[in-house]
Amino acid sequence: PKFKKLGFIDIKGLYKTSPLATVSMFCTGIIHSALFSLGAVYAASINFTLFEISLLLCMITLAGGVFQWPVGYFSDRVDRRTIIVLCTSCAAIFCILAIVSSGTSLQNMHLAINIGIDKIMFFVYVTLYAGMAIPIFTLNLAYINDYIAKEKFVAAGGGMQIIFGLGAILGPFICSALMN
C-alpha cells in the first residue's frame, strides 16, 4: 500500500494500543521457537525414528500454513480477541493431549485421562496443536492493526516482530528447562 508518510510506534506504544496483542505475541515467540527448536529433540527422546521426526516437523509446518486460511476467515468475521483466545485454548488442550499420548511423565502422574501411548494420536494432536498455535502470530498482527492508523502498520509490524523475537530467544531455554 502507498502511504503519504510512514508513522512510528515504539514497543510501549504497541502495548498501550493493545496489551493483548503484545503479550500474546511475546508468548507466541516462546511457543513457536520451543516447538521448532525442541520438537525434534522431544520426539527423539520418546524414541521416534528419524523418518518419524521428519514427518512430525513436516506436519507441524503444513498445519501452521494450512490453518491460516480458516483461522483468518473466522477472524475477519468474529471478534479477533475471541479467535485469539479460542486458538490459544485449543492449542493448550491439544498440547496436553499430545504430551499425555506420548507416554511421558504427565501420564505417569495418574491423570484421569485414559489415552493410550499411540504415535498416530501423538501426530494428530501435535498437528492440531500447530494448526491452532502457529496462526496466533498473524492474528496478533491483524488485531494490533485494527487499532492503529494505516501509516503505522509497517512500524507496528516491525515492533511486533521484535516482541516475537524476544519471546523466541527465551523459548528454547524455558522449554529445555521444563523438559528436564
Protein language model regions, located:
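Transmembrane alpha-helical segments of major facilitator superfamily
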Residues: L55-G64, M160, F164
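Residue-level signature of mid-helix packing/kink "hotspots" within the transmembrane helices
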Residues: T61-W69, A168-I169
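Juxtamembrane intracellular "pre-TM" segments in multi-pass secondary transporters
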Residues: K2-M25
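Intracellular juxtamembrane helix-capping segments at the cytosolic ends
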Residues: I134-I148
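Structural signature of the two symmetry-related core transmembrane helices
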Residues: T82-L97
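Interfacial helix-cap and linker-helix signal at transmembrane-aqueous boundaries
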Residues: A43, F74-S75, S176-N180
